[in-house]
């Protein structure tokens, strides 16, 4: 009996010693991450392993994946390769449950007790890699952050009026600094410019210096909304012609605000400190939590308006507008911000009114639970009865979008080309004029659209351009001059081939297209010139195509008649590969054959002509390479 008792005590002591060697850090604070999709719930340190307990937050029935090349790096620079996963298999899809929340563990070698923090990374060669920096191992606080002198919080005067926007086509300087920066955190940023003439676009990539600073210049025609997307957050500010705007980005606070585990912790200061022109307004706008959106939930909108006619729908939209404007008016914010937010509400109301017939039809199909075929037939044949002068009357109260305040509204860059351009006559009737900033921007935007489609300005268009403000004239002429240079340069470019499909039946079309490349691996890209993700993907693929140069891989691009011929002809010189442009009937047939639901859609064809992989949406360079190599090898 004594012997049994002794053994039991000995085992208990051994267990206690083993347990004592474990250190558990619950929900450790961290400095930065690339995604909110994986978050560290706890870290368990022992002399045999380091285990990260991960909580995953992602779309239900979608997957995430952890690279087998993942590693930890401690603050001393030592790295520790991933050993295994518990509840997840590295390099294999982890499917999210209905709740959109999952959990698993990642096991690494033990880390010395001298380490105070670790970084987790899937590596720089993984597209969209998960990375978390500065995971703390010694307590619940991050190291103290010393703010630079220029990181100030501006005092807001609620009586401040919105200043007149500066209208001039000139460089705006954008400067910034990322706090807690270290090489590898992020190497570049891409400012987004909400240009009222060109529409929203991404400017050139800006390199971040080793001290976390960056600077760039962007030509804008007026005071313009701009933004930087960083660490999952959109940082908005104003770019002003001939002037400087600056942002100091508090990385740890920006990420803390998005953390499931730390969002209620004490703040680390402001997420962003604004400087330069309109810094106070940028700060106030950034911190504002007032709702200004009428169309934030289309599905709910369709439910709300089911059974309404056009008049009732208009009243419903104006009811929502009135509620939003009332909440803005009561808010303790500056007159300047009230003007900006009010203009955004009116822009959304105008968008909603422009969609009257579509919304009523969609609400009807959902209410009656129509099939796709039934809904398509209904959309093509149903006529929504509109009261006389419906659009003119409905747009009449929204004249604020024809005032200078609209130039502060980032929604303007989308509202005009996509929703209101076809309603110009009704807007003229509604407001009793065809003059004003809205009409100037609309005309300039129309001229720019033809340039964007690789069509230089005509003599008639030059006459229209001459009637516009000098800033609009200069921006459009600058774009036209750049186009003329591009067209001339395209004449000398090689590396692309325009192919004809010949006289073949639809059933033989695809096999005929790929037949001349038999014996090679083919990456087929169904794309369109108007498809932004397609164009971004083509640019992203350039380094991979260079890396695989010399291998028996053919890059085959297929588009349809929705890609304007001239635009297509002048875009493909920069897309090396084999190009085909199909008729609408041919495109539709292949769309049905391969069940293509959107562009870009990729097929990978083996050397015998068999489809081995299909994916809609650009999956990233790394995954395309992986799938190509599976077939190639």
Where is each model-derived feature located?
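Oxidative protein folding and maturation machinery
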Residues: 251-519
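Thiol/disulfide oxidoreductase modules built on the thioredoxin-like
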Residues: 585-629
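Structural microenvironment flanking redox-active thiols in thiol-disulfide oxidoreductases
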Residues: 536-573, 586-592, 626
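Short, solvent-exposed, Trp/other aromatic-anchored flexible loops in extracytoplasmic proteins
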Residues: 81-126
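Short, well-ordered beta-strand segments enriched in hydrophobic/aromatic residues
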Residues: 49-59
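A non-transmembrane, solvent-exposed segment enriched in polar/low-complexity residues
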Residues: 86, 134-336
């Amino acid at each position: 009996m004594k012997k049994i008792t002794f053994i039991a005590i000995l085992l208990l002591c051994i267990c206690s010693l083993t347990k004592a060697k474990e250190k558990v850090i619950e929900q450790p604070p961290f400095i930065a991450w690339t995604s909110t999709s994986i978050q560290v719930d706890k870290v368990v340190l022992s002399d045999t392993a380091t285990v990260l307990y991960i909580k995953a937050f992602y779309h239900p029935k979608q997957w995430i994946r952890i690279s087998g090349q993942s590693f930890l790096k401690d603050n001393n620079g030592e790295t520790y390769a991933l050993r295994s996963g518990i509840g997840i298999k590295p390099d294999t899809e982890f499917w999210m449950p209905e709740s959109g929340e999952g959990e698993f563990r990642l096991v690494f070698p033990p880390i010395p007790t001298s380490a105070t923090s670790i970084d987790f990374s899937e590596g720089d060669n993984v597209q969209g890699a998960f990375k978390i920096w500065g995971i703390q191992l010694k307590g619940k606080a991050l190291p103290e952050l010393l703010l630079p002198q220029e990181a100030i919080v501006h005092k807001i005067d609620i009586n401040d009026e919105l200043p007149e926007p500066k209208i001039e086509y000139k460089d705006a300087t954008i400067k910034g600094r990322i706090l807690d920066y270290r090489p590898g955190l992020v190497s570049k940023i891409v400012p987004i410019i909400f240009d009222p003439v060109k529409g929203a676009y991404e400017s050139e990539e800006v390199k971040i210096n080793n001290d976390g600073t960056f600077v760039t210049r962007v030509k804008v025609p007026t005071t313009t909304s701009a933004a930087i997307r960083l660490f999952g957050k959109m940082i908005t500010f104003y770019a002003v012609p001939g002037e400087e705007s600056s942002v100091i980005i508090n990385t740890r606070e920006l990420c803390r605000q998005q953390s499931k585990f730390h969002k209620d912790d004490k703040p680390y200061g402001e997420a962003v400190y604004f400087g330069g022109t309109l810094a106070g307004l940028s700060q106030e706008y950034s911190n504002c939590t007032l709702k200004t959106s009428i169309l934030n939930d289309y599905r709910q909108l369709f439910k709300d308006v089911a059974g309404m006619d056009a008049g009732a729908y208009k009243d419903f939209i104006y009811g929502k507008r009135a509620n939003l404007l009332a909440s803005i008016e009561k808010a303790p914010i500056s007159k300047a911000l009230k003007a900006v937010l009010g203009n955004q509400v009116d822009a959304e109301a105008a968008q909603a009114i422009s969609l009257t017939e579509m919304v009523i039809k969609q609400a009807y199909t959902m209410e009656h639970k129509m099939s796709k075929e039934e809904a398509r037939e209904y959309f093509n044949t149903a006529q929504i009865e509109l009261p006389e002068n419906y659009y003119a009357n409905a747009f009449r109260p929204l004249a604020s979008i024809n005032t200078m305040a609209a130039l502060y509204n980032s929604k303007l860059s989308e509202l005009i080309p996509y929703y209101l351009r076809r309603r110009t006559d009704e807007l003229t009737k509604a407001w009793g004029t065809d003059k004003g900033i809205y009409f100037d921007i609309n005309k300039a935007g129309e001229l720019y659209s033809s340039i964007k489609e690789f069509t230089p300005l005509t003599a008639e268009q030059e006459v229209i351009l001459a009637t516009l403000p000098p800033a609009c004239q200069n921006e459009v002429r600058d774009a036209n001059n750049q186009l003329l240079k591009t067209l001339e340069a395209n004449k000398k470019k090689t590396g692309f081939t325009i192919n004809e499909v010949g006289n073949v039946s639809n059933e033989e079309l695809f096999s005929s297209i790929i037949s001349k490349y038999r014996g090679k691996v083919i990456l087929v890209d169904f794309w369109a010139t108007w498809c932004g993700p397609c164009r971004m993907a083509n640019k992203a693929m350039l380094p991979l195509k260079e890396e695989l140069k010399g291998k028996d891989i053919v890059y085959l691009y297929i588009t349809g008649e929705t890609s304007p011929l001239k635009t297509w002809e002048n875009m493909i010189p920069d897309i090396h590969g084999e190009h085909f442009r199909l008729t609408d009937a041919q495109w539709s047939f292949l769309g049905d054959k391969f069940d293509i639901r959107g562009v870009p859609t990729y097929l990978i064809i083996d050397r015998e002509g068999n489809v081995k992989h299909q994916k809609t949406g650009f999956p990233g360079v790394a995954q395309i390479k992986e799938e190509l190599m599976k077939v190639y090898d």
